[in-house]
Amino acid sequence: MKIVADENLAFTDYFFSEFGDIQHKAGRTLTHTDVQDAEALLVRSVTAVNESLIQNTALKYVGSATIGTDHLDIQALEKHGITWANAAGCNAQAVAEYVITALLHLDASLLEQQEKFTLGIVGLGNVGKRLVYMAQLLGWKVIGFDPYVQLDSIENVSFQALLQQANAVSIHVPLTKKGEHATYHLFDEKAFAALQPNTILINSARGPVVKEAALIEDIQRTQRKVVLDVFEHEPVISEELLNMLALATPHIAGYSLEGKARGTQMIYEAFCQKFGYEINKRFETQLPACEDYFSGHDLKAVLKQKLSQIYDIAQDDANIRACVKEGKVEQKAFDLLRKNYPLRREWAAHGGPQA
């Protein structure tokens, strides 16, 4: 069996080598010719799996080691009888930890504020639920908005109420362009007008959920602290926007070693179910041990003293800013940052909590 895999996927050889010949390719530039005689295709969100890519191929299975599916033309896949799978929730823990890290980097005093600090979470799916848990461990008040999900552990509010009440807003929705609750440009001029000027905004979901032109106008007006891991016109990012952001990172919020490995395992399991193979491999056997920071220690004390050692978000911010050339970060530089990213470990690997 020929298997084509994005070169940036983790542990593909470990999980898939026994099934056939694996060809590693750059996901963003994958062509019909690359996959024409492949039976399985393993991708990330940078690959648009659409009619032009999959028509007249030998493909029987497409696995995307990602939370989202907006890069998959599911209608086309089903038309051609191609089984597909994604990895919903694979890196949810890493994204939740990213948000906590970003907030504490911007204001370490949040560790002491307890319920004086209100975190508003837009989207209460896999990531949102884990972020609720982690934020409540720190004593923060959490409010949430999701038209499809209500959580008993928090105050569920309207979108407008969340914008008006939260001290920080973190976005965790898929990108959708149709329907009553479409998320494309959910954060537009009207939404920014409702936000309090000193409310922190974090987007680690999908870039086009935030209308970039409206965001730039808002920051110019309010000097708001904004953290972006995703960008509307990604992978090209303007220097103008970068210079306005409190923190910027190259779409790596979910890039923990555990998250990447978990994503590959999930599409491996779906692959085995499709082709009738026994599921007998676990990613945990491939992970190295790392230093225990948390066991026997107070959570807040550890975060106060060791946060930058667990995850140095300032370095990621510096790295993307160093890639600016002629007024922007270009695709090649952006993709290299992601390809060469030194995968961090989740808190649990250091003996810490996990939602």
UniProtKB/Swiss-Prot annotation:
Pathway: Cofactor biosynthesis; pyridoxine 5'-phosphate biosynthesis; pyridoxine 5'-phosphate from D-erythrose 4-phosphate: step 2/5. One of its GO terms (biological process) is 'de novo' pyridoxal 5'-phosphate biosynthetic process. The active site is at residues 206, 234, 251. Its EC number is 1.1.1.290. It catalyses: 4-phospho-D-erythronate + NAD(+) = (R)-3-hydroxy-2-oxo-4-phosphooxybutanoate + NADH + H(+). GO terms for cellular component: cytosol. GO terms for molecular function: 4-phosphoerythronate dehydrogenase activity; NAD binding; protein dimerization activity. NAD(+) binds at residues 146, 229, 254. It comes from the Bacteria. Catalyzes the oxidation of erythronate-4-phosphate to 3-hydroxy-2-oxo-4-phosphonooxybutanoate. It is found in: Cytoplasm. This is Erythronate-4-phosphate dehydrogenase. InterPro entries: D-isomer_2_OHA_DH_cat_dom, D-isomer_DH_CS1, D-isomer_DH_NAD-bd, Erythronate-4-P_DHase, Erythronate-4-P_DHase_dimer, NAD(P)-bd_dom_sf, PdxB_dimer_sf. Keywords: Cytoplasm, NAD, Oxidoreductase, Pyridoxine biosynthesis. Gene3D superfamilies: 3.30.1370.170, NAD(P)-binding Rossmann-like Domain. SUPFAM superfamilies: Formate/glycerate dehydrogenase catalytic domain-like, NAD(P)-binding Rossmann-fold domains. Substrate binds at residues 45, 66, 255. The gene is pdxB. Homodimer. Pfam families: 2-Hacid_dh, 2-Hacid_dh_C, DUF3410.
